[in-house]
Amino acid sequence: AGVCAFSACGGNDDSTSGGNVEVPEIEKIDDLTDERYVNLYGRNFYNENLEGMTFINSASGFELKFRGTSVSAKLCKIGSRDSMWSVFVDGETDSNARVLTFTDTKGVFIQETLVEGLSDGEHIIKVLKRTPSNFDRILVKEISSDGMFTAAPEKPSVNIAFYGDSITCGEGVLRDYKPSDSAKYTALTQNALQSYAAYAADKLNASYEIFGRGGITLKFRNPETESYSVLNNYMSYAVDLSVANGDCPEYDFSSTVDAVVIYLGTNDYLRSLKYS
């Protein structure tokens, strides 16, 4: 069992971002931080060495608007497991309808199709990560289409930050229930977009971001076996990335959220039973 702590924060003054700004149409997006064309979700950072925007956290991703029939991305996948993503087109809500699986690219950027075969016209696509931060990440260098990119759609006026563990990340939500199942935490059985965080945000018409992963504690840790907890590493872009070791820059909190939800208890309690 666990407990959720909820805290409201002072949000941004702007009720929306994107959507209402007229911008020149472009054929390719090579700067994913350009808010005129791209909405980013979650804690993401640009990797200077590999020259790509890093998407590592559950439910992180991007959203854009274009005129055409298909969109592709030049990306590099890193990690020990497949990286699985959901694509939503024109307001779709089923996270299992369009699923992408990216396998290891050996450090090389390759062109991957995100969506194709759409009717020729204006579309909005959102691409979000299903899998957790400790097993995979992708870096995106550029996004292209067979048409033109237009101004990014409006983002929700409310953004919620969730801090938690496997339950928050939706790990194992797609498995058949078994009391003991070694396969319950695989890329195929995980979907952060079907976690309580996703459903809560949907009910509130909010965007959301997740910081955490399966097995992580909020505070307690054994320094001999556990490098991080949420509390001792929340200044990072992901719970298992070290700012001190140069894994990523320190997180920039200038982008405020409207509420913070902290999932308390489960792993901290289990560790307390193991260690005095």
Where are these regions (language model features)?
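C-terminal motif of bacterial Sec signal peptides marking the signal peptidase cleavage site
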Residues: A5-A8
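N-terminal secretory targeting modules
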Residues: G11-Y163, I167-A192
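Conserved SGNH/GDSL esterase-like catalytic core that processes O-acyl groups on lipids
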Residues: N57-A59, V173, S182-Y275
